[in-house]
Regions:
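Conserved, single-site charged/polar hotspot
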Residues: 1-356
Length: 356
């Protein structure tokens, strides 16, 4: 009887402990399962990390090989031979240094980076075109510039002197933009570098090369540049006395009436608004000729005679052909990238990596 009671008690204890034992076993099994899963996850992450490292290594090697290829290719590019108009000396400048110095000289460093890139590609393209023309004509230099007067190209030292306390900021911004695109040029449908003309501000629409220089260029045709109307200096008025006008026109042999109000008559304008024919006394000139004779900012002008002086009101600044620099900055601020900007102004051109 005592044995039976003892067994019954033992069974009761076992029954009471059984759920606890099961729970502990279940917890242990769960812990083991979690440990196995964690170990598997660690191994997966390690394998993934190895794959990533391998991929990054291969990509880096590929980039290094590509960079070496580019360096070798660009190292074969001839430096530009630049005639310094101030000193009369010819200096050789590497392509990359020229592009950086040209952008620094020709476009405000405060402009958007995409506009600076567009200027860099334009400068490289123009210089390459000039270099090839110079080789054909057996010239001693490719083109001229006047670094001392900040025209066409400047050295880093000249930029440092000009920019002063802003040198690090401005030179750094220009250099970064040039570094990204200095190997690129704009080409025509035959893959040849275009005549990458540019100017400061258009009259609101660019002019064709044919109307300005008499030679048609497939990529230098009128393009919309309405953003230029927001540029500082878009509209300017220059007053000139009759005596000064007469002196400026003397080399043309023009005979002028006694009444100054009868001296000028605009005869014709291009579709972009630039004067293509103007009567000056008994001589007919084009707008570009009168602009150069009188030192006007643009050949899109109006003429009036008020209070004893001539008033020449101009729209834009420059010849108006090709890339408008202020227009490029305007488009950049609207979200356009440098390729879109260049292909907008150089109609039909394509931006690509330069070949040998």
């Amino acid at each position: 009887m005592k044995i039976t009671l003892a067994l019954a008690g033992l069974m009761a204890v076992c029954i009471a402990l059984f759920p606890m034992m099961c729970k502990r076993n279940a917890e242990k099994i769960l812990q083991n399962t979690q440990t196995i899963q964690q170990n598997a996850s660690v191994r997966e992450r390690q394998e993934e990390a190895k794959k990533q490292q391998t991929a990054e290594k291969e990509e880096k090697e590929s980039e290094n090989n590509a960079t070496k290829g580019k360096e070798k290719e660009s190292a074969d590019w001839k430096p530009f031979r630049i005639l310094d108009r101030s000193s009369g000396k010819i200096r050789e400048v590497s392509v990359k240094d020229y592009v950086t110095g040209a952008v620094c000289s020709e476009m405000p460093a405060t402009f958007s980076s995409e506009a600076l890139k567009a200027q860099a590609v334009s400068a490289h393209t123009w210089a390459l075109y000039c270099q090839r023309q110079a080789e054909k004509n057996a010239q001693d230099y490719d083109f001229s510039a006047d670094p001392e007067n900040w025209q066409g190209y400047v050295t880093k030292e000249q930029a440092k002197e000009r920019f002063g306390e802003y040198f690090s900021e401005y030179w750094g911004k220009v250099s970064r933009a040039a570094d990204e695109v200095w190997e690129e040029i704009a080409v025509d449908s035959d893959g040849e570098p275009i005549v990458a003309a540019y100017h400061a501000i258009s009259s609101g629409r660019t002019e064709s090369a044919e109307n300005v220089w008499g030679n048609a260029q497939s990529c230098l045709v009128p393009a919309d540049s309405s953003g230029d109307i927001h540029a500082p200096g878009y509209r300017k008025t220059k007053t000139i006395s009759p005596e000064e006008v007469k002196q400026c026109l003397s080399e043309t042999g023009a005979e002028l009436p006694e009444n100054p109000q009868e001296w000028f008559s605009i005869l014709e304008r291009s579709g972009s608004g630039y004067v293509t024919a103007v009567q000056a006394g008994n001589k007919q000139l084009n707008g570009l000729q009168l602009r150069e004779l009188l030192g006007l900012r643009s050949s899109d002008f109006e003429i009036s005679f008020e209070n004893g002086v001539f008033c020449f009101t101009t729209l834009g600044y420059g010849h108006g052909v090709g890339l408008s620099q202020y227009g490029a900055d305007y488009l950049a601020r609207q979200g356009k990238n440098y390729r879109e900007i260049l292909e907008h102004y150089y109609v039909g051109a394509t931006v690509q990596k330069r070949r040998l």
